[in-house]
Amino acid sequence: MRFTVDRLDHLVLHCADVEKTASWYQRVLGMDREAFGDERRTALKFGGQKINLRPIGAAAEDWRTSAQAVAGTGDLCFIAAVRPDDVVGHLHQCGVMIESGPASREGALGPMVSVYCRDPDGNLIEISSYFNEPG
């Protein structure tokens, strides 16, 4: 039987400091924090997705996840329903350094405009808007 997947439910992000990472995603990207599981793990929720935060050094048998637990190797693109200039202004207000952008890119749904920064672990964070021009 052949099938296709429908959407992404969650992903696991490896981080050096769960508290610092969770606070950054809450403050900068407006995500909601949630504790889950018997071990009271930390997740970040947004839209219909979530990011589970796995601390570096957590026992492999406690997490069913990637073979290598390395912080700072992620490249994540998030969609925002605001203009790119608003993203730039918000990142500046949060004290987050912009690495690149606004720049035109091709997303899953077509042309978009992206602004790039890094989270506390060095993961590349792309914040994109489906607007036709960088302004």
Model-derived features: where do they sit?
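N-terminal beta-strand motif that seeds the catalytic metal site of vicinal oxygen chelate
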Residues: 1-19, 74-76, 130-135
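Vicinal oxygen chelate
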Residues: 1-4, 88-135
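Short secondary-structure boundary/capping segments
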Residues: 3, 42-43, 65-68, 106-107
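Residues that flank catalytic or metal-binding motifs in active/ligand-binding sites
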Residues: 7, 40, 47-49, 72-74, ...
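Core segments of cupin and vicinal oxygen chelate
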Residues: 12-58
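Short, conserved charged micro-motifs
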Residues: 20-21, 83-88
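A short local loop/turn or secondary-structure capping micro-motif enriched for an aromatic residue
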Residues: 52, 59-63, 133-135
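Helix-adjacent hinge/juxtasegments
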Residues: 66-77
